């Protein structure tokens, strides 16, 4: 299983036309802490846990929190947990030793917030459904929300604020939604995050979704939580498009891929170029799929 949650890993480390909007949305200000606390959630089998962690650090550099076994859900469960800190983004890795309680495993990321109750209220007011009501964990509180289009994310807060290094590049949450729900998702997330649409391309190259003869709509959003790419498609996607959760930006794509291959990472989509990027898709040991890209300077 791939997808996961960030509940207690910190234990280890102690509009209908929203796409046209170009300014920040009216929001509940001050909820976000910073993009280094936007952690992609990765589930792997316990036997693949160390291989994944080792390969991820070998590819991007960085460091690890202490590994442990915890209960990180509001109902009984047990999982291996560890944070991986890299210059291009943080991941929370989980290897469940028990069945995973519903709906955990369906959320893609965890966002650290300054006030969980305020964040949950703001999410509801912005059109999100709270699918896991706030609950206590040993270091704070957590909730899971679902945005229009079925996009699940965790909101979390800790009694003692963690302190992570500033990232060299901001990872990109990559969200695939249908045309019928895209504007509702964009409008709601902008309202919640106070984000800004920095690009809305109605005819982005289909090579980005494995369909080089077609075009599709791609919306890019930035906020204090981090970066978002909203990929609006009809769902006719060849593998592995849509299976990735995050895009990681590196300064040298070829050098990063060389490190990845030495670490046992499999290239699923060979590097290709678009107007502003060279990109590839890879699969890490344990099954986690990611997009990796370098910005093309023109």
What positions do the PLM features span?
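Catalytic cores of nucleotide-enabled group-transfer and carboxylate-activating enzymes in metabolic
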Residues: 91-96, 128-131
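Bacterial N-terminal signal peptides that target proteins for export
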Residues: 1-6
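N-terminal signal peptide c-region/cleavage motif recognized by signal peptidases
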Residues: 13-15
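Short beta->alpha transition motifs characteristic of CBS
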Residues: 156-161, 292-298
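Short, structured interface segments
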Residues: 143-164
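Vicinal oxygen chelate
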Residues: 35-47, 82-84, 96-122, 141-146, ...
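Core segments of cupin and vicinal oxygen chelate
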Residues: 31-34, 41-89, 133-148, 175-227, ...
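Boundary at the C-terminal end of the N-terminal hydrophobic targeting segment
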Residues: 18-22
